[in-house]
């Protein structure tokens, strides 16, 4: 396993531009290339060349065969948002291919609710349920993602919720704003919406991580990401399931208090 983590005194929240990141590192500073006939060994490994358990990865199915029930359950432990009470909308996402919002259930648990594209019902939510279990079995840290179906009676707006319009202007969110978001989401024959409810991770979100370099504000992050065996191992896994959206912008670093 990795050495015991050192305390992180201050860690900045990082925001990345997907377009800038792609253009800069494609045209300005392309990544390291292996010399002909040579290869660059992976780092962040033990004496046997295996990745070490820790903040990035841990041993699961390959080292200890998981049961069918464990594989089906994946990372899910807490459960889906409670259906016997209102979901309070505390923020909303209007940009991107699919809209979404953040809710608190009656237990005050935070979930990120994401929908399918209107043209492809069940596509994103179904693929997510499969992929999250594959990566969990491979040993990666993934969030709890639950498949939910709900109707408009489940939702209520929280106080002082703001939303951003197409011009980037923010205003207090109204019931009409919520209705306009949901107008772009397909419903089933029963009139309910199908979505993924992703449980908020414990700790302080620090934004996405990069697939190269290290975080200067994290004394535990000492192995360049492009040479980490666990991150290198993600490449064939993503290729296997055709996960072409596994970019930095879709990752997250979290500053956790416990192990």
Place the predicted regions along the sequence by residue.
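Conserved kinase catalytic-core segment
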Residues: 123-128, 209-259
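Conserved ATP-binding subdomain of kinase catalytic cores across diverse folds
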Residues: 73-211, 242
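Generic marker of "main functional regions" within proteins
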Residues: 26-37, 67, 145, 150-160, ...
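Regulatory N- and C-terminal appendages and interdomain linkers associated
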Residues: 1-91, 107-108
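General secondary-structure edge motif
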Residues: 3, 83, 115, 217-220
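Extracytoplasmic/secreted proteins, especially bacterial periplasmic and envelope-associated proteins
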Residues: 11, 15-18, 22, 126, ...
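Short, well-ordered helical secondary-structure segments
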Residues: 3, 7, 11, 44, ...
